[in-house]
């Protein structure tokens, strides 16, 4: 199955990425992607865009040539209290908030500290998706984070790039996460974590993980635009009229 939704992409505003939103729209049309989120790194990353980049995201059209664009961020979990680098002005302009651990902001800690930080980030109610929770550099209590994600209605990501060129060794953890989320009745999100437009929508390896554990298709945010949009509305985000036809 070729999914039509990608929740995790980076533009050249994150200067270790290489494509514009225009590039992503063109690639989306080529691949049949009907909705994607632009989720550049939060400002505490060394080469991330300024907070104004996110505050001004209101200028991004909702629809371009039949492709829907969600305004988002991949925020950084900053400490064990679950604080993220996304202030209220930024949050007010964003449709979707991803958050995860990045070594440049939060150095890897022991399993208990990492787990506490991740759960606290979910508990605060600002984050919709936890990115690459299977990163072996940040060990966590997988069952505890899956239960917390189900409790706080947060999706855990199966990150496709983790199996290709980053976060080596994530496959075993991601399989365990998929099983734990399945058993807890929670949500998963598959993200390409694309840093160049050509990998937009590349979710095949994430899908293979879900297939291996018989993960229920109706608990995958990428299943359709409407599933993702309904999930975001269930988390308090407003209805977006421009997406009514998706």
Curated annotation (Swiss-Prot):
Protein name, entry field: Probable phosphatase Tola_0828
GO CC annotation: cytosol
Keywords assigned: Hydrolase, Metal-binding, Zinc
EC class of the enzyme, as a word: hydrolase
Disulfide bonds: none
Binding of Zn(2+) 1, residues: 8, 10, 74, 193
Listed cofactors: Zn(2+)
Domain of life: Bacteria
SMART domains: POLIIIAc
GO biological process, one term: bacterial-type flagellum-dependent swarming motility
Record-linked InterPro entries: Phosphatase_YcdX_put, PHP_dom, PHP_phosphatase, Pol/His_phosphatase_N, Pol/histidinol_Pase-like
Positions contributing to Zn(2+) 3 binding: 74, 102, 132
Family: Belongs to the PHP family.
Pfam families, alphabetized: PHP
CDD domains found in the cross-reference section: PHP_HisPPase_Ycdx_like
Positions bound to Zn(2+) 2: 16, 41, 195
UniProt GO molecular function: phosphatase activity; zinc ion binding
